[in-house]
Amino acid sequence: MNRWEKELDKYAELAVKVGVNIQPGQTLFVNAPLEAAPLVRKIAKTAYETGAKHVYFEWNDEALTYIKFHHAPEEAFSEYPMLRARAMEELAEQGAAFLSIHAPNPDLLKDVDPKRIATANKTAAQALANYRSAIMADRNCWSLISVPTPAWAQKVFGDLRDEEAIDKLWEAIFRITRIDQDDPIAAWREHNDRLARIVDYLNNKQYKQLVYEAPGPIFTVELVDGHVWHGGAATSQSGVRFNPNIPTEEVFTMPHKDGVNGTVRNTKPLNYNGNVIDGFTLTFKDGQVVDFSAEQGYETLKHLLDTDDGARRLGEVALVPHQSPVSLSNLIFYNTLFDENAACHLALGKAYPTNIENGASLSKEELDRRGVNDSLVHVDFMIGSADLNIDGVTKDGKREPIFRSGNWAFELA
């Protein structure tokens, strides 16, 4: 019997009932690495018991990904199986829920030409644009969770043997996702309620700008008019509540694509498609990255920024307290799902249309006029620390504290 059998049962239940919140008669689509097979079986069983009509799954294998990037001809990375793209669109149109299980090897493609990776990413993003638009507009319930793999566990706990490292990573995941509590679903209900109170507070404020102060120059982010803060649970267009990310500690909203100025430096490594980018700075002027540097992964960062015009602009600003459970673990996960919930972060690329009033019903032209960024990519990177202060600027120019020393500057009942 698996050492984590009880916890895996609870994790599967959390993914099905809180993550995607499967509804009677609904289809669930699961994308997962081969290493997640025991958990996927539990998820399928729980989904059917909860009323799912179908559970479809798609396996991925990093060894095959590695082989392709090293041996496939160049033209292979400019092609995408449109049969899969159409299948994803059809599932979305039919109201399916989508669960992705993410277990990255941060160094998988470190010796691959970054141009190959950039071409493959852009090709996939173009082919899956309609599906991703549906997901980012919350037309469907979707969720992202993670499971340990030997490569990932070794990156986080490099001083331990594989089995010990995997056990330590499972322990961290179960603690951070509240699986270690007696009733994880109730714990998540309480957590979502707390995040909702913060969201309500910030939505009522409707700050026109955020001012970031940490060691270094001031960094400013203008927010779009009619911006909407979100955090914790989301609501699909059919009215079903779901949690897109497990874990999540953030509240986030939409910057104006032309209203970002100053220089920011990352505070945690960014794992981007099998490569680590670290020690990097981005300098913005009138919303656009006009200069950048990186101590590690410079070419990968360059190709990311060159994806399209929107890749050099921000699509998301997110606030996460330094005292979050992920941060308090004192671990660097090299997995954005976890690391973004340890620190305030920004996202290059496409904005979530739900972060502006009536955004899901606006045309691309209307969204552009209102300052909403569009891109083939959406990549979060972490800038928060214990030294970070953030003020909100009201419409009449008054500055009010939001963060002090990396944590919330206000108390809510």
From Swiss-Prot:
Highly thermostable. This is Aminopeptidase 2. A divalent metal cation 2 binds at residues 316, 340, 378, 380. Keywords: Aminopeptidase, Cobalt, Hydrolase, Metal-binding, Metalloprotease, Protease, Zinc. The keyword Nucleotide-binding does not apply. InterPro entries: M29_Exopeptidase (IPR052170), M29_N-terminal (IPR035097), Peptidase_M29 (IPR000787). GO terms for molecular function: aminopeptidase activity; metal ion binding; metallopeptidase activity. Its cofactor is Co(2+); Zn(2+); Mg(2+). It comes from Geobacillus stearothermophilus (Bacillus stearothermophilus). Homodimer. PANTHER family: AMINOPEPTIDASE, AMINOPEPTIDASE AMPS. Belongs to the peptidase M29 family. Binds 2 divalent metal cations per subunit. Can use cobalt, zinc, and possibly also magnesium ions. GO terms for biological process: proteolysis. A divalent metal cation 1 binds at residues 250, 316, 340, 345. Broad specificity metal-dependent exopeptidase, releasing all N-terminal amino acids. Its EC number is 3.4.11.-.
